[in-house]
Amino acid sequence: RQPYLLCGHLDRVVNFNGDKYVMDQKTTTSTPGAHYFNQYEPNNQMSLYTIASQVIFGSPIRGVIIDVAQVAVGFSRFIRGFTYRTPDQTEEWLKDLRYWLRLAEGYATEGYWPQNDTACDKFGGCRFREVCSKSPHVREQFLKSSFEKREPWNPLKAR
């Protein structure tokens, strides 16, 4: 069994009002009010940013500053929001991560990955939706004809 390595790229880390924060930039076409910022509590990306920053810098991170650019026809608007994680929340997130990793290990051992059909329409829709909607015995053919196999993304490579 190999150890897991969580990795990615932080946009930046800043000092703000005497505290250390991770900063993230987002764009949206909708109005970024309270409802918009609610999507970041809870949120895997923001929780992991908090945890990773604390590991990397060896000191507490107060939270994540989310700078949002609303892009619309004829105007742009910029809004700043904040999200915070308590030590209990980060511990719970890590516990949940261990659970999901064990589950994924079981899928890998079985050689079977069940569909998560509640996520097909998220974030503009899954690229594999057309394949998954086919009968299981023809999916491999659709994969080969509609997709190109590439080298997996490696976040350890410099951008």
Say what each PLM segment does.
Residues Q2, N38-E41, T50-R159:
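Metal-dependent nuclease catalytic regions and adjoining charged, substrate-binding loops involved
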Residues R1-M46, T50, Q54:
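Non-catalytic protein-protein interaction segments used by genome-maintenance enzymes to assemble
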